[in-house]
Regions:
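A beta-strand edge to alpha-helix "cap/lid" segment located at domain peripheries
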Residues: 1-24, 28-132
């Protein structure tokens, strides 16, 4: 099993549009984000469509685990958005399940490694979520 397929999916979740999210997130997915909290697929998709996308992301301290058509990723992320000079740092984990020929995200969790309110406010994401 080549882990690069799953890591490529993960990178696209950070960088691509809401269309990728809509296609690759499982219907019953559970997502956990700083400030926002626990959300389902619909709420996650709505938030993704309203917030500026990241323009760069780097993963470090990567861990990959695979068993029975399920893949788990754990890593530290460093992301940057085009509209700000500020970076976002988080510890993350994602769980994917293989459905036919593609990987579907079933769970994702982020824990910010710095002041999350400041990070999201600078990116414009905090006001987008709470003013929707």
């Amino acid at each position: 099993m080549a882990d690069h397929e799953v890591w490529d999916c993960e990178r696209r979740f950070w960088l691509d549009s809401g269309n990728f999210y809509k296609e690759q997130v499982a219907p019953d997915a559970v997502l956990v984000f700083p400030i926002v909290g626990i959300v389902d697929r619909a709420a996650g998709l709505a938030w993704t469509r309203k917030t500026p996308r990241w323009t760069q992301v780097a993963f470090s301290n990567r861990i990959f685990s695979y068993a029975a058509e399920t893949a788990v990723l754990a890593y530290e992320a460093h992301a940057e958005a085009a509209k700000t000079a500020h970076a976002y740092y988080a510890c993350c984990s994602s769980t994917y399940v293989r459905v036919r020929e593609s990987w579907m995200l079933i769970a994702h969790q982020q824990s910010a490694l710095a002041n999350i309110e400041q990070q999201l406010t600078e990116r414009g994401a905090l006001s987008v979520f709470f003013n929707s």
